[in-house]
């Protein structure tokens, strides 16, 4: 048997979901499914119809149909058995067989279809095995979701920690810069010492000038020493 595609359609033949197992274009699948309702008779008890070199094996799901599209050489009994298995899978996954519910659980349904059929050939699996596999997949997805959420939380905490660390570094840098600047008292002390030094220098210069002036005055007022004059006659008198 070769299953070309499995689809869930409404009564008008519009595909809600469809899974192709062999190379078929979407247009081709939609064209085949749109012709399907016209081939189905409400009074007929048959679950197979044929058209355009393909066979439709179908089963009602309330207001919907689950349909296998197979080639004409496929084993009808095996196809019907596969169809029953897939319909049980759908009813076990979805709580109600409505279009909205089918779309909501489309991923799980596709996964179950792939477990039951490989490249169009029926795999030797039971409904229990498929459900177990789906539960394992769901459990792994939950674990992965938890791991991803924990990673996001850790990344958020790391960003907060880095922001806080940068703020502390900025505060520390500002504090050190403030400590290295001289205070107002230091500025006043430096100014006072400069003025005092200037005045002290001026006083020393004034005292040196006064000492030089007094020394010059004393030198000018002192009596001049007379030296010996040569060649000048002395006025002398002889006394007898």
UniProtKB/Swiss-Prot annotation:
Q: Where is the composition biased (Basic residues)?
A: 231-240
Q: Where in the cell is it found?
A: Cytoplasm; Nucleus
Locate the region Disordered: 215-240
Keywords (alphabetical) are: Cytoplasm, Nucleus, Protein transport, Transport
Which Gene3D superfamilies does the UniProt entry name for this protein?
Answer: 3.30.450.60
| One of the GO biological process terms | endoplasmic reticulum to Golgi vesicle-mediated transport
Q: Which cysteines are joined by disulfide bonds?
A: none
Against CDD domains, the record matches this protein to: Delta_COP_N (cd14830)
Q: Name the GO cellular-component terms.
A: COPI vesicle coat; cytosol; nucleus
- Judging by the UniProt lineage, the source's domain of life is Eukaryota
Indicate, by first and last residue, each region the UniProt record lists as having compositional bias (Low complexity): 215-226
Q: Hydrolase among the record's keywords?
A: no
Q: Name one Pfam family in it.
A: Clat_adaptor_s
Question: Function of this protein?
Answer: The coatomer is a cytosolic protein complex that binds to dilysine motifs and reversibly associates with Golgi non-clathrin-coated vesicles, which further mediate biosynthetic protein transport from the ER, via the Golgi up to the trans Golgi network. Coatomer complex is required for budding from Golgi membranes, and is essential for the retrograde Golgi-to-ER transport of dilysine-tagged proteins.
Q: What family is this protein classified in?
A: Belongs to the adaptor complexes medium subunit family. Delta-COP subfamily.
Quaternary context: Oligomeric complex that consists of at least the alpha, beta, beta', gamma, delta, epsilon and zeta subunits.
PANTHER family associated with the record: COATOMER SUBUNIT DELTA
The name this protein carries in UniProt is Coatomer subunit delta
Species annotation: Schizosaccharomyces pombe (strain 972 / ATCC 24843) (Fission yeast)
Its gene? Answer: ret2
